[in-house]
Amino acid sequence: MKHILLYILATSTLLSCGSDTKPAEQSTAPAINFKTSSVPVPFAGNWISETYLSDIKEHQSPRKAQENIEECYIQLPDNTLRPSTMVINFHEGISDLVTVNNNGVFQLWEKQGDTLSTLKYTIKPLSRDTIKIDDKLFIKINSSPAGNEPRILEEILFKGAYITKKGEHIEFKSNGEVSGFGKYKYYKPLIDYFDAGLQIDQVGLGETADKMEYFGFKFKRNKLELYKLKCDLYDEVDNRCVEVSYGIKAYDLQKSSGE
């Protein structure tokens, strides 16, 4: 289900993610009332699992990268007491995590009603662009929001200028817009592949942001190849393709030097 992640992220005003899931640690709630002890969070922003980011840089395949992570993304608020969601595998999430400052230590707590119930994660800043959530590293990224859904692959994989074999200039922007690509004005790479019909990396191209035509894609370092989708197995009951592969190559794009 391509829209599971969007549904999860929409349940909270903020988001989250990391590497390997760690069992919840039971602890006594902070003595200070969490409803009144609001302080600035010095490392607010969008944070992505270092494991996921490294895999994307090495293999350039979101589908492959999704196989190696659990906690993967979180958006931390500007101030404590505001909710966040820890995104798990880009498929589900732990919502309503409350950021608190417990005697100088920033933590994420689960709550029941208005009561902090369970210490879920401890956050330790390491540098301006790196934090540790429990024992997992997260890297700060500048992902443009799309409602409550972050544009992650747009920022870390697609963004940049490209040239076609005909010398046409195309630009994929981090906000999900594309220019110079004929009728296509928007693009949306899929980040969640835990469903039928998602056996290959896919990206949507559309004249509008809410109606996309999906293509299979392959990155070969600075080369982006887009393919028509080939349906190998169609489900007559659900009226959808449940197994796909790469079909005819539709576009061959070369990323400009320096991107």
Specify the residue positions occupied by each region the protein language model found.
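Hydrophobic helical h-region of N-terminal Sec-dependent signal peptides
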Residues: 6-11
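Short, conserved catalytic or interaction motifs in soluble domains
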Residues: 19
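Positively charged n-region of N-terminal signal peptides that target proteins for export
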Residues: 1-4
